[in-house]
A protein has these predicted regions:
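Periplasmic-binding protein-like
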Residues: 542, 681-711
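Extracytoplasmic "Venus flytrap"/periplasmic binding protein-like
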Residues: 419-489, 498, 612-620, 636-637
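Hinge/lid segment of periplasmic solute-binding proteins
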Residues: 459-514, 526-532, 642-648
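Short, solvent-exposed loop/beta-turn-alpha elements that line the ligand-binding surface or hinge
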Residues: 475-488, 566-587, 646-657, 790
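Helix-loop-helix "hinge/cap" segment bordering the ligand-binding cleft or interdomain interface
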Residues: 109, 190-192, 196, 498-604, ...
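C-terminal capping/gating helix-and-loop segments adjacent to ligand/active sites or protein-protein/ligand interfaces
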Residues: 726-805
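Conserved N-terminal structural module of periplasmic/extracytoplasmic solute-binding proteins
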Residues: 23-26, 30-106, 110-115, 156, ...
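Extracytoplasmic/periplasmic substrate-binding proteins
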Residues: 588, 593-678, 700, 704
Length: 813
């Protein structure tokens, strides 16, 4: 893992109005003047509603590969049984047969739902080279070699007049593995699959004749109304003329965005202009160079052609936005979530816009039993008055958790009475202020505009809201629930979230933020204070560091404060304790870390934290336990000598803290608290809990996951009997493998009882929750900077921090 990725992980650990359809929003965003362009997220109204209609695929279609919309028709590729059979001999010597499949193109009528195969499409190219597809040649030993071919359509795109473009690759190979010719083609088909023209990608023209096996990849194909074709492979944009000839290309430093289309006549890339604003930069085939630049939203990394109302569309945070032609304002056009559609199930390359305003997408959903299905979704605008209204409950968040988004969709679809309407304040972030949305939310709450529910991703000041009396105690709801009583939940994470015995937020899942050390170094300490850490460090060779050498003062300060927040702040009584020996000791602990890591002078090869621990170069590894797979890997990587000692704390308590992907709150002003609890309790359903990546908060799901993780499967023969190794022992089956950095791949097997007991001991001993109030962290970082730079004493810094945080607390009352 690189330092930048590692730093990102550190930050993540730390910072750890509609009817039944989508609404049409007001126009109050981007300024048309590029110099004054802003990107505040739009508010929504219920002037229009979009209603989803799903179409199931025909039974013989196993999987949609790639798709596009040309005109008002959806085209897609799929693998279907072709009536053939193949056989192979398995490891036991038994002959096994299976059906063969062919790749087919379908045309889907979005008005009738009729799905038609393009019978005129020829699935393989005509190959004259006998060494190529389905050819025959002589091997070096004089034997005859028969080459078979495999053709795959990698991507497709709309063309002019209802046609479609495909990029397909055909590879040939002999039974002995000898590689034949590889053929790449851009082909244009009419609505029935008849071949109109073929273009050979420019890479093939320059292919090394001694290397006949080539794999060309094209991510994007676009065409304009003059017949020019544009391709993009993440490195180069190539442009071809109406006659198929190569025109020009752009690559390297000239490309810093995504190939996309603004209109039928304008193809180009999204890029940053000289003044740092986002623009659409047109490719001009006539001049063979860049053409005009059009200002676009700073959130529009990939755009789609507009219609009679909008200049272009783009997606952001699970919604579709558009820039209005009449005002130049960017507004939210469709909120997938408000349409009861989970945007997690839709790929950006598998949806499009029809001329009549409908939106079409291919959806993918998986189930907990391992099954999956695809459907075709059509969103049609409807009169809002015709939609049966429900009680709407506003849920505020700052970035919506992936799994929670799916659960909201499920709840909204199934509930006859309630609808959760999400307002994601991360949409208000600007290039200059990432936390602008949090500021807006706090301002609205202070002014009395309080949401019904809050979903916290460890970045919102929940304890502050609770101290203001804005949040409901959730224990009475749990105690009164007929199914989810306290003893049905993992109580330790909940108890750590309590304030004076009240539970103001309920986590949907949990993990444990901790620091790992080797038992041979960190065992034997009754406490784990800063002095204990320094004592343990003295046991290691000279030059060893407490944590990874890349961590800076700023990173470690935020880490330590977030892990120790409950030791220094009490929102309920409005006090803080930064002018203390304990906090000064924390500052002194942070000071030896570098202000900035000197990458230029570092010539050493990267070593993972696990390697540094085992080599005596590092005392502790900050990480989080999220699942039993994490647990198994940690023990295996450290030769079963892992100890979860956590971060140093001066009060003698454990240095571990719980975290969660999302915690849920009900506000005291909620318009329907029974409905709000109905939604929260839906996140406790066993199917949802068992699908989470983190540890479930539902005890039965946690225990079921533990049982599954501790159950070892073994290799068996066709009769179900265990296969034994040379020593007469059954052969365990790995559930997968994990590798970090320079560490070798470690196969994952069943968690042992000892490992299970270790994680339970960590959970049972943890008493705090990672608490991040970004405003407090900013104050501490600002005032600690002088001490860390040597211009202030630790006493001066702690007094300034105490004064400013105290004032901040009083201001928030």
């Amino acid at each position: 893992m690189t330092k930048r990725m590692l730093s990102l992980c550190l930050v993540l650990v730390l910072l750890l109005g509609v009817l039944a359809g989508c609404s049409k929003p007001e126009t109050k965003t981007d300024d048309k003047d590029p110099a004054a362009q802003t990107d505040a997220a739009p508010e929504t109204t219920s002037q229009y509603a979009y209603q989803p209609q799903y179409y199931d695929l025909p039974e013989d279609i196993q999987w949609i590969g790639t798709s596009c919309i040309s005109g008002d028709t959806l085209y897609f590729t799929a693998s279907v049984p072709d009536g053939g059979k193949e056989t192979y001999t398995d490891e036991t010597g038994a002959e096994v047969s299976y059906d063969t499949y062919s790749e087919v193109i379908f045309r889907f009528d979005l008005d009738t739902g009729e799905c038609v195969k393009l019978d005129n499409y020829v699935a393989e190219p005509v190959v004259e080279d006998p060494n190529g597809a389905n050819g025959v040649t002589m091997g070096q030993d004089g034997s005859m070699q028969v080459f078979n071919s495999s053709t795959n359509i990698q991507t497709m795109a709309p063309g002019a007049d209802g046609t479609i473009w495909l990029f397909r690759q055909t590879n040939s190979y002999a039974d002995d593995g000898t590689e034949g010719t590889s053929i790449s083609e851009l082909i244009q088909l009419d609505a029935h699959g008849t071949l109109l023209r073929t273009i050979t990608p420019t890479e093939e023209e320059d292919a090394d004749e001694t290397d006949s096996w080539r794999y060309t990849y094209i991510d994007t194909i676009l065409s304009d109304d003059k017949g020019y074709v544009y391709t993009y492979d993440y490195q180069t944009v190539n442009v071809y003329g109406p006659d198929g000839s190569f025109v020009f290309s752009k690559s390297g430093d000239e490309l810093n965005g995504q190939l996309c289309q603004l209109s039928e006549s304008e193809v180009g890339i999204t890029a940053s202009s000289a003044d740092g604003k986002m623009v659409f930069r047109q490719l001009d085939p006539e001049t063979k160079d860049w053409g005009k630049e059009t200002p676009i939203s700073s959130r529009a990394w990939n755009i789609y052609p507009g219609n009679d109302v909008y200049t272009y569309f783009f997606t952001n945070n699970g919604s579709i936005f558009g820039e209005r032609k009449d005002t130049g304002a960017v507004e939210k056009v469709v909120d997938w979530l408000a349409c009861d559609v989970d945007s997690n199930t839709i790929s950006n390359d598998q949806f499009g816009f029809l001329s009549d305003g409908r939106i079409v997408a291919v959806t993918y959903e998986s189930s907990n039993d391992g099954g999956s299905r695809q459907q075709i979704l059509v969103l049609a605008r409807a009169d809002a008055d015709s939609v049966q209204p429900k009680t709407e409950l506003a849920l505020a968040c700052f970035g919506l958790d992936y799994n929670l988004r799916s659960q909201i969709v499920k709840f909204n679809r199934s509930s006859a009475d309630y609808r959760i309407v999400v307002k994601d304040y991360s949409e208000y972030a600007t290039d200059d202020d990432y936390n602008a949305g949090l500021t807006k939310l706090n301002t609205e709450i202070i002014s009395g505009s309080v949401p019904d529910l809050i979903a916290n991703n460890m970045q919102m000041p929940i304890r502050q809201y609770a101290a203001k009396g804005l949040l409901e105690d959730l224990w009475p709801y749990i105690d009164a629930d007929p199914e989810y009583s306290r003893d049905k939940l993992m109580t330790k994470p909940l108890e750590s979230l309590q304030t004076d015995g009240k539970l103001y937020q309920l986590p949907i899942d949990f993990g444990v933020t901790t620091a790992i050390g080797l038992g041979k170094v960190v065992d034997g300490y009754d406490t784990w204070t800063l002095a204990d850490v320094n004592d343990a460090l003295s046991k290691l060779p000279e030059g060893a560091t407490v944590f990874n050498k890349y961590y800076t003062q700023a990173e470690m300060l935020q880490y330590c404060v977030a892990m120790n927040a409950d030791s220094f702040m009490n929102w309920q009584d409005g006090t803080c304790n930064f002018d203390s020996d304990e906090f000064r000791a924390l500052l002194e602990f942070v000071k030896p870390f570098p202000a900035e890591y000197d990458w230029q002078s570092d010539s050493e090869e990267y070593e993972s934290d696990y390697s540094r621990l085992k080599n005596g170069k590092q005392l502790l590894y900050p990480t989080s336990l999220y699942s039993f797979n994490d647990l198994y890997y940690t023990f295996a990587a450290l030769n079963n000598d892992a100890r979860f000692v956590g971060f140093p704390r001066e009060d003698g308590s454990t240095g571990n803290a719980f975290n969660s992907d999302a915690t849920l709150c009900i506000t005291t002003t909620c318009r329907d608290k029974a409905g709000a609890w109905a939604f929260i309790r839906s996140t406790l359903e066993e199917d949802f809990q068992k699908s989470l990546w983190n540890f479930p908060i539902l005890k039965s799901a946690f225990e079921a996951n533990a049982k599954e993780a501790m159950t070892q499967e073994y290799e068996t023969d066709a009769d179900g009997n265990q296969i034994l190794d040379e020593n007469g022992n059954p052969i365990p089956i790995s559930t997968g493998g994990i590798s970090y950095g320079d560490e070798p791949m470690i196969e994952l097997y069943a968690v042992t009882q000892e490992q299970y007991d270790a994680v339970m001991a960590v959970i049972d001993s943890t008493t705090s929750f990672v608490d991040d109030d970004q405003n407090v962290l900013n104050i501490i970082s600002d005032e600690a900077a002088g001490y860390l730079a040597g211009s202030k004493t630790v006493e001066e810094a702690s007094k300034l921090i105490q004064s400013r945080v105290s004032l901040y607390i009083q201001e928030q009352k």
